[in-house]
């Protein structure tokens, strides 16, 4: 899930239990954000796991790590290559069709005139950041945001881990209110700000660079009554405490980026900080959660 991958390692796994084990190990090892881990279940029940690295990984070390956590079965399928990040993202965006999600539709510039007029359009320009709407986690967040907006108008919104800015732009377009967006990754900060302007909500979406809640802007802008955070399970668990401190009573939180088997641990971490789960969407092996702060 890193925005500017150039080196790739991929392998397949036959059992869900082994896939769970190896994804847990890899997301733990790469918590610092120097690699992005993605896992997809194929229709035949096999799992494809892909890692993207900004710097070339030590192949022998990585092979040992995945074989130790997933077993010898993956050894023959493990392959390393490099991808031209910009061309790869551009090419994949050009192939993509608009993605409807509730009242929203996410599309590229080539589809500007072809999307349904009754939807809130979010145009995402080809860029080195995550979040075109096609991934199950982004779609899950948009669907839960749509659900929240049916019964309330949050007044203070945070999109933590904004990537292309897709969720912040969706919230700003629907609410016509200021949204704070943050990302650990400088290119994503630039891309999200550009996409905010492209979608004519640049005056509402303020994008900052921050790791988790480590910036004074959060205390100044908070407490938030809606937080969207589509990052991995491990960072989400670590962020439970600081997030709870930045929430208004009754605030809603939308979490995504976790594989479905990781949801119970994430729910437990947030429940311990006074957040109760309201909804659980499962899309393509990924979970998106809606929680509410009690009191
Ligand atoms: C899966 S992408 C989500 C992008 C977009 N919000 C979406 O829903 O499609 C996760 C984003 O979170 C950022 N990120 C990861 N860990 C973070 C952290 N601890 N603090 C802030 N941003 C983080 C990554 O750089 C990446 O842009």
Curated annotation (Swiss-Prot):
One Gene Ontology term of the molecular function aspect: protein methyltransferase activity
Entry-linked InterPro entries: Ribosomal_L11_MeTrfase_PrmA, Ribosomal_PrmA_MeTrfase, SAM-dependent_MTases_sf
Amino acids binding S-adenosyl-L-methionine: 138, 161, 183, 230
Catalysed reaction equations from the record: L-lysyl-[protein] + 3 S-adenosyl-L-methionine = N(6),N(6),N(6)-trimethyl-L-lysyl-[protein] + 3 S-adenosyl-L-homocysteine + 3 H(+)
Gene3D superfamilies on file: Vaccinia Virus protein VP39
UniProt keyword list: Cytoplasm, Methyltransferase, S-adenosyl-L-methionine, Transferase
Subcellular location: Cytoplasm
E.C. numbers: 2.1.1.-
Major location category of this protein: cytoplasm
SUPFAM superfamilies: S-adenosyl-L-methionine-dependent methyltransferases
Gene Ontology CC terms: cytoplasm
An individual GO BP term: methylation
Coiled-coil blocks: none
CDD domains named among the record's database cross-references: AdoMet_MTases
Domain of life: Bacteria
Described purpose of this protein according to its UniProt entry: Methylates ribosomal protein L11.
PANTHER family referenced in this protein's UniProt entry, alphabetically: ELECTRON TRANSFER FLAVOPROTEIN BETA SUBUNIT LYSINE METHYLTRANSFERASE
Classification via HAMAP family: Methyltr_PrmA
Family listed: Belongs to the methyltransferase superfamily. PrmA family.
Listed name of the protein: Ribosomal protein L11 methyltransferase
Gene of this entry: prmA
